[in-house]
Amino acid sequence: MKTVLDYYGLTKMPFGKDIIVDDIYRTDQLNNTSAMLRLGLADEDIILMTGPVGSGKSVTLRTFVHNLDLNKYTPVYLRGNNMTQPELYKFILQEMKIEAPRSLIKVKTLYFKTVMEATKKPVIIIDDAQDMTDDALLAIKAMVNFDQDSASRICFVLVGQPELRQTISFSHFESLRQRIKLNVHLSGMSLEDTCGYIDHSIKIAGREHLIFSDSAKSEIYNRSEGITRQVNKICYQALVGGAINKRDLVDSRDLIPVN
């Protein structure tokens, strides 16, 4: 979008996905969630984090993993995508650079042996966990049981959309639910954080002066309900329209409806 870059004096297009971790805007929610995840790592077996699409789960995970002490923890990232119980064991071993046997009994035995002997605590992050099969979700309760030692040997971070919380509310997930002492639900940004996020995004794209007026930022918050992905879409479209129409300052009347 060279026209936009040239018109507004930007070095790159803001409101995209290619932001580096150090440039991520630290909202109150991100700071609080990151602190909770960090504190939960030492003692918790299972952590639950949910939020609607575009609420910042991926950014939170990136920040969380980026700040992990790799001398103490081994992060493993998996996606739920219809993952079955055998695949869950297999994928964890593979990500830990261990060849997984085909037999479910053998793969379970090797999993427990590997975790017991690990010098660094594995942190298993399962994104889109709402898409896992029931048998895989149910298996997690057994996968954190190490009767020989009361210490937490492994930590599962289950990340998903709000339906994940609904799924584990069913009675057959009660034993799993009881093991989850730390759970976080993400929502939209506040008005203050939405305005700060917009200004920050413009600044890291190379421009010191503001592009969006206060009324525009307020209207963007109202339309997006503070959901980051929606904020990005509205702002991106407004920048394109603003450059085409030569609007030095984007006002609320310049905002384009975005589905």
Feature names for model-found ranges:
Residues M1-D43, I256:
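A short, basic N-terminal segment
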Residues L78-N81, I168, K181-T194:
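Conserved AAA+ ATPase "SRH/arginine-finger" region at the nucleotide-binding site
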Residues L5, T84-F91, E99-A139, D147-I154, ...:
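Mid-core helix/loop region of P-loop NTP-binding domains shared across ATPases and GTPases
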Residues K2-V4, A35, R62, S175, ...:
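C-terminal alpha-helical "lid" subdomain
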Residues I47, L70-G80:
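Conserved catalytic segments around the Walker B and adjacent sensor/switch elements
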Residues A42-T63:
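Walker A/P-loop nucleotide-binding motif
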Residues V65-N67, L164-R179:
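Short regulatory helix/loop adjacent to the ATP-binding pocket of P-loop NTPases
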Residues L10-K17, Y73-P75, M83-R102:
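Conserved NTP-binding/hydrolysis module of P-loop NTPases
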